[in-house]
Amino acid sequence: MGTQLVLGSSSKIRKAVLEAFRIPFICVSSDFDERSITYSGDPFEYTRELAWNKANAVRSQGFSDSLIITADTVVVYEGEVFNKPESEEHAVEMLRTLSGTSHSVITSLVLMQNEKVASASETTQVSFIDIPPQHLKTYVQAFSSLKRCGGYCVQDGGGLIIKQIEGCVYNIQGLPIKTLNQLLMEFNISLWDYLA
C-alpha cells in the first residue's frame, strides 16, 4: 500500500466517488486539451485515447513513479458523441435530442505507472423520460449542465429526467468502480483493502 495514487482529474464528482472508498490519493489536473483529439467514429477508441493522453500529461508533471488514474466519459446516441456542452443553448439541444430516448454512457479508464499501462471501458445504458420542453432550460440552469457530458448529471437532478439505468451508476459519474478495482488489482492494489 505504499504506492502514491494520483487521480488525474479536476472533476469533483470523480474525486467524491473515489473518496467514498477510503483509498488515499491526490488530485492532479492533467491540463490536456481534449479538443486536440478528433472523434473518428469509435467512442471506445476515442475515450481510451483521451484517457491515455490525460495520464501521460500527469506523468510528465513528475508523477511517473505514482499510479495515475485517468478517465474519459462520453454520451453516445445514434453514433453521435455528446461531450460537455459549449453553451446553455447547446446543453438544451442535447437534452432535447436525448429526451424520450435511450443512450449509452461510455467511460474509459487508464491506469499508468512508469511504463506499465492498463485500460478498460465500461458502458451503461440510460433512458430519459419525455422531458417537457418548457423545463429543458430550467434543468440546464439549475444543475450546472455545462460541466457534464450530455448536459446532465445523475446525482444533480438526474432523478427528474432519468427513467431507467442499466449498468453501473458510477460509470455515469465518470468513475466505474468495479472496472477501476479490476485494473487496480493489476497493480496489486484492491479497494477492498481500504474498507476494513
Swiss-Prot record:
Its EC number is 3.6.1.9. The active site is at D72. GO terms for cellular component: cytoplasm. It is found in: Cytoplasm. SUPFAM superfamilies: ITPase-like. It is an enzyme of class 3 (hydrolase). GO terms for molecular function: nucleoside triphosphate diphosphatase activity. Its cofactor is a divalent metal cation. Its main location: cytoplasm. One of its GO terms (biological process) is nucleotide metabolic process. Keywords: Cytoplasm, Hydrolase, Nucleotide metabolism. Pfam families: Maf (PF02545). It catalyses: a ribonucleoside 5'-triphosphate + H2O = a ribonucleoside 5'-phosphate + diphosphate + H(+); a 2'-deoxyribonucleoside 5'-triphosphate + H2O = a 2'-deoxyribonucleoside 5'-phosphate + diphosphate + H(+). PANTHER family: BIFUNCTIONAL DTTP/UTP PYROPHOSPHATASE/METHYLTRANSFERASE PROTEIN-RELATED, BIFUNCTIONAL DTTP_UTP PYROPHOSPHATASE_METHYLTRANSFERASE PROTEIN-RELATED. Nucleoside triphosphate pyrophosphatase. May have a dual role in cell division arrest and in preventing the incorporation of modified nucleotides into cellular nucleic acids. Belongs to the Maf family. This is Nucleoside triphosphate pyrophosphatase.
